[in-house]
Amino acid sequence: MQAFAVAALSIWLCLGATTLAESHGPQHCTSPNMTGVLTVLALTGGEIKATGHYSYDSTDKKIRFTESEMHLNKTEHLEDYLMLFEEGVFYDIDMKNQSCKKMSLHSHAHALELPAGAAHQVELFLGSDTVQEEDIKVNIWTGSVPETKGQYFLSTTVGECLPLSTFYSTDSITLLFSNSEVVTEVKAPEVFNLPSFCEGVELEEAPEGQKNDFFSLFNSV
């Protein structure tokens, strides 16, 4: 874990964190409702795994992610996920063919909310702290996802606790989740409504030894 934190922090510094602010050990924070664009990059090979719009209900712990039609360098259908963390399930939705899969979510951790066990590492300025409106103050957090043996490195804004980016790593993958065009509201609450063709779909069991979580879903696309 310590080696991972040091390596991840080094990457962050290279991305433009120019001024180190004194850390005061902030309390764990909670993200607001959000609508925005999420881009997922595989750091090995530099492949964009997915990019699309999302809505996040931070109260009821729901995410709807719909992959952008501009991401067309793939042969399969565009990804459309409805993740219900309180229920511990997600739906893989195919609007074109009106089909749906329902599977278990084995972890509540994801890139749009600071996980409960996250440990604060440092507070940083992105940009310049001496030029007005040319800096963003962020908190850096690290932690692990025991269910998938993954480790993460997550940055949130100081104040509203908006997640900016998340590095997620296991023995086999390293992904970067970038959050942009964020609006602190759910613009269309109906996106959390289950399509009629998904109602009554039976839960599919994951293959033995496979653990499904937010991060692994994007590694499979």
Swiss-Prot record:
- Tissue specificity: EPDs are synthesized in the meninx and secreted in the cerebrospinal fluid.
The places in or outside the cell where this protein is found are: Secreted
Say yes or no: keyword DNA repair present. Answer: no
Give the main localization category.
Answer: secreted
Keyword list (alphabetical) reads:
Calcium, Glycoprotein, Secreted, Signal
PTM entry text: Binds calcium through the terminal sialic acids.
Q: Which residues are glycosylated?
A: 33, 73, 97
Single GO cellular component annotation?
A: lysosome
Biological processes, Gene Ontology terms: cell-matrix adhesion
A GO term, aspect molecular function: calcium ion binding
Which stretch is the leader sequence? 1-21
* Purpose of the protein: May play a role in neural plasticity. May be involved during axon regeneration.
Cite the PANTHER family for this sequence.
Answer: EPENDYMIN-RELATED, MAMMALIAN EPENDYMIN-RELATED PROTEIN 1
As for family, the record states:
Belongs to the ependymin family.
Supply the name of the protein. Answer: Ependymin-1
Give the organism, scientific name.
Answer: Oncorhynchus mykiss
Instruction: List the top taxonomic levels of the source.
Output: Eukaryota, Metazoa, Chordata, Craniata, Vertebrata
Q: What gene, per UniProt, encodes this protein?
A: epd1
